[in-house]
Amino acid sequence: MIKIETVLVILKEDHNFRDIVKGEEYFFSYSGLTFDSISYDSREADASTLFFVKGEAFKKEFLEKAVSVGLRFYISETDFQVGIPVLLVNDVKQAMSLLAMEFYGHPEKKLKLLAFTGTKGKTTTAYFTYQILSQSHRPALLSTMNTTLDGETFFKSTLTTPESLDLIKMMAQALANDRTHLIMEVSSQAYLKKRVYGLTFDVGVFLNISPDHIGPIEHPTFEDYFYNKRLLMDNSRAVIVNSGMDHFQIVKEQVASLEHDFYGADSSNTIKDSQAFSFEATGKLAGNYDIQLIGRFNQENAVAAGLACLRLGASLEDIKKGIAATRVPGRMEVLTQKNGAKVFVDYAHNGVSLRNLLSVVEEHQKGKIILLLGATGNKGESRRKDFGLLLNQHPELTVILTADDPNYEDPLAIAEEIASYISYPVEKIADREEAIKKALSLTEREGDAVILAGKGADAYQIVEGEKVAYPGDYALAEKYL
């Protein structure tokens, strides 16, 4: 429940209040309204709802329909003139975040909040953190791959970082379920679209940065993408930063006045004696660790998670147990064919993560390597060039280009765009299942490998704006072993 008087105080303190318009009249103060629900979905609105108008696709008819079933007040950047009072603000998403916190009783102040940002590795690092904190605490997890608010039931999120109203509601649910910590991934879009406005994290972790999500509907430039990633540092009490990341110097200067730990190159927290399923750490996490996820980059993610948890009181024993217990669906999952060849299923969906994946596989598999991948339609268009230029440096690969969430684009046209940057022949098969069947048929012996990149554990393809059922790369690999 929230009163209109409280709404006005919060918005005025945030310098985000313009006025309330009722017909031809303008008000600076208002009273007599109490709201029992808050929503940005007009289909959920009724007489007791504080309704937010957000999004460029919002239509006046949505509001008119809500008014017809009893809606009596709304918050917006525009007066739609539908016969009820409107509270006008400069930024409705900003307002939505702060008012959601008040409505749900400020759960963000009662949970320990950990957030991860980076171009790659957010999900894996969040999983490491969840397993570490689960040893002695009761964490909730908000992840691209899986979300749990009670530690028992898991569901998939549609956004890396939910809309602020949904996010705060989930925090309240986690608190009601007796959770002590909340671990989440924070995308650059989360800051660009004010989904985490007003939140302060106990620990923020910056894993890495590389050009990605650059396109008409995401970030116009790399600078804009990088800036929005760095905002997590400004909104965290303590930070963990990968000192080996590109453009580290600006991040180092930005966090100088904060509590911080660096890990990786030229720091005291490094990895030595890196093996396929174990590593030794130096510095604050000094010791030997078992790990199920192969690849040095996964070991670095484990160190980042360990340092973050250490700041929240986790013991080294908890950190070791948590790292050893972590596996992630669709992240470096390995199957073995009847002929002994390995099949790697991984979510690698940009140039940097694909480069890391190739490096790990080529380190352990010395025979023929078949790579299957595609690029998403209508988003992240820069990835196509990144993939093509990277693959052009690996003429030893057998490459099959296929569909990966083509959306409104032709998957073969996307494949042609990737192939235009590759100087050796590649195969193009639009049907992903047929492409996987073909890829697995090309191996001959132990030492050979197939890499199924991009989809990870996703059991759908996005086609013409809809999620179409898809068995999943792992299930199809099992089918054709």
UniProtKB/Swiss-Prot annotation:
PTM statement from Swiss-Prot or TrEMBL: Carboxylation is probably crucial for Mg(2+) binding and, consequently, for the gamma-phosphate positioning of ATP.
Residues that coordinate or bind ATP: 118-124
Which compartments is it annotated to reside in?
Answer: Cytoplasm
Where in the sequence is N6-carboxylysine found?
229
UniProt keyword annotations, A-Z: ATP-binding, Cell cycle, Cell division, Cell shape, Cell wall biogenesis/degradation, Cytoplasm, Ligase, Nucleotide-binding, Peptidoglycan synthesis
The family classification in the record reads: Belongs to the MurCDEF family. MurE subfamily.
UniProt-recorded name of the protein: UDP-N-acetylmuramoyl-L-alanyl-D-glutamate--L-lysine ligase
